[in-house]
Amino acid sequence: IPTRGFLGYRGEFIIDTRGEGIIYSQVIGFRPYIGEIEHRVVGSMVSMATGKALGYSLWNLQERGVLYIGAGKEVYEGMVIGNVSKGYDISVNPTKGKQLTNMRSKSSDEAITLIPPVELTLEMGLEIMNEDEYLEVAPKSVRLRKKFLTETDRARFKRQK
């Protein structure tokens, strides 16, 4: 396996072995480029709204896949906020709040418990990034975003392709 094949594998290895595995690599020599390395195809959860991510909407979205952001984070249209195991992207609204009513009942006021989001690192971002995405590296954060931020631009590009 070439060295570029190990890019991002460390995190997956730790999850697979539950932290008990030992990984070892050795340089045998240099060889010419053979071709692309296949990787697992995952889809992205793409924000379709700009604003502050709310706990209620993230609570509903965490059932669909793994989230990269927590409640209270600023999001913008076209930002990748998580991934889904399906092979295609889905547009979601992480800024949607709970509908307020005058009725009070025990069943409607459930406590929201969020699964802690996965902290996106530079290595992980390079591993899971698709061809139609950019990796934004800022001093305080690492984010994924689509090349075309609006949903209409992404659909137009897909049709031309």
Describe the residue ranges of each PLM region:
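Accessory interaction regions appended to the cores of large information-processing enzymes
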Residues: I1-K161
